């Protein structure tokens, strides 16, 4: 039987939601991750240090794993203050602030409409060593949804990188060759997370033979040429790319609707799905760096010291999984996953 032992991985982009669903989402993500960076786009958004620490307490209250720890982030708004950034940084639990362009994704209505308005905050973040996480899409209606990431790189991200060269920036859940190339060519303070579903799927999986709502996420799946570029970047061994699932659960009812929510649930099998990608590319030797080393190295945090073991043993993903009082349909529902964490 084929086995693979790696340093315990981390998830640098995770949505746990809030309320009664936390019991399920924390269980799934805590099964083998050492740490997870928790996204702040709740309703209302996590915009203050107190809100972030309170959210962390709610997560920890249902966290039964002694190897899993949540890392928190703030939701950046045009009203965020420099004092709030300093206060958050001083806690030791909040390591980043997330820039959501207003209207770009789930619960992003409180996001930033004009990046220039948060430039004073970015200056403070650069001084304090607080990382900037970015959902990299423009939201103007004249830009096609498949082009919003590329346009963001040219019009928003490039000026930020130029104006704040010492600010550490993570371009989250990249979906295009353009984004992968931007990160590769940028300086050492720019990195990116890549999801399992953007490595495994392209827009044909979502649209051919009928609409598959559980593949609908933001940024949206792109054509296969972009998928191949993401696979190359993720498996390359470059320290600029690391694991961030963007596992984003919604109830089955909210996904299978006339106006369905954006987000795919992969926390139930994230490392197993990434392992498939690396195996298919003949790059299993690079999985540990992508999953376990590059993230903490970029965040200036220690690597995990324990390990997990994956076994090449197929198992069938449940059709649905518990999600508070509802159910969530996970990626690969009813289908085989080729690796299993023992």
Swiss-Prot record:
Cofactors (names): Zn(2+)
Binding site for substrate: 15-17, 41, 135, 218, 250, 262
Keywords attached to this entry: Hydrolase, Metal-binding, Pyrimidine biosynthesis, Zinc
InterPro entries: Amidohydro-rel, DHOdimr, Dihydroorotase_CS, Metal_Hydrolase
Gene3D superfamilies linked to this entry: Metal-dependent hydrolases
Cofactor descriptive note: Binds 2 Zn(2+) ions per subunit.
Gene Ontology terms describing biological process: 'de novo' pyrimidine nucleobase biosynthetic process; 'de novo' UMP biosynthetic process
The protein's annotated pathway: Pyrimidine metabolism; UMP biosynthesis via de novo pathway; (S)-dihydroorotate from bicarbonate: step 3/3
PROSITE patterns: DIHYDROOROTASE_1 (PS00482), DIHYDROOROTASE_2 (PS00483)
Matching NCBIfam families: pyrC_dimer (TIGR00856)
UniProt-listed PANTHER family: DIHYDROOROTASE (PTHR43137:SF1)
Family per similarity comment: Belongs to the metallo-dependent hydrolases superfamily. DHOase family. Class II DHOase subfamily.
Protein name per the record: Dihydroorotase
Species whose genome carries this gene: Aliivibrio salmonicida (strain LFI1238) (Vibrio salmonicida (strain LFI1238))
């Amino acid at each position: 039987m084929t086995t693979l032992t790696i340093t315990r991985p981390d998830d640098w982009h995770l949505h746990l939601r809030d309320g009664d669903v936390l019991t399920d989402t924390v269980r799934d993500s805590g099964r083998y991750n050492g740490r997870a960076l928790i996204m702040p786009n709740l309703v209302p958004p996590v915009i203050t240090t107190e809100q972030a620490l309170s959210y962390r307490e709610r997560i920890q209250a249902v966290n039964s794993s002694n190897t899993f720890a949540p890392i928190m982030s703030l939701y950046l708004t045009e009203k965020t203050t420099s004092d709030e950034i300093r206060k958050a940084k001083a806690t030791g639990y909040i390591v980043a602030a997330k820039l959501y362009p207003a209207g770009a994704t789930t619960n992003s209505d409180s996001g930033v409409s004009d990046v220039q308005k948060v430039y004073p905050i970015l200056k403070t973040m650069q001084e304090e060593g607080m990382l900037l996480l970015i959902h990299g899409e423009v939201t103007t209606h004249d830009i096609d949804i498949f082009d919003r990431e590329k346009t963001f790189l040219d019009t928003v991200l490039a000026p930020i990188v130029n104006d704040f060269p010492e600010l550490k920036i993570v371009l989250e859940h990249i979906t295009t060759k353009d984004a992968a190339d931007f990160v590769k060519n940028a300086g050492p303070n720019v990195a990116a997370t890549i999801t399992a579903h953007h490595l495994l799927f392209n827009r044909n999986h979502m649209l051919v033979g009928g609409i598959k709502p559980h593949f609908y996420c933001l940024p949206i799946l792109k054509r296969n040429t972009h998928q191949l570029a993401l696979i190359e970047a993720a498996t390359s061994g470059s320290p600029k790319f690391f694991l961030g699932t963007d596992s984003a659960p919604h109830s089955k009812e909210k996904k299978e609707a006339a106006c369905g929510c954006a987000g795919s649930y992969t926390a139930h099998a994230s490392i197993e799905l990434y392992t498939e990608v690396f195996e298919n590319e003949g790059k299993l030797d690079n999985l540990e760096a992508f999953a376990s080393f590059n993230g903490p190295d970029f965040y200036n945090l220690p690597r995990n010291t324990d390990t997990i073991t994956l076994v090449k043993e197929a198992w069938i993903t449940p059709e649905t999984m518990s999600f508070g009082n509802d159910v969530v349909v996970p990626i690969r529902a009813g289908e085989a996953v080729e690796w299993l964490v023992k």
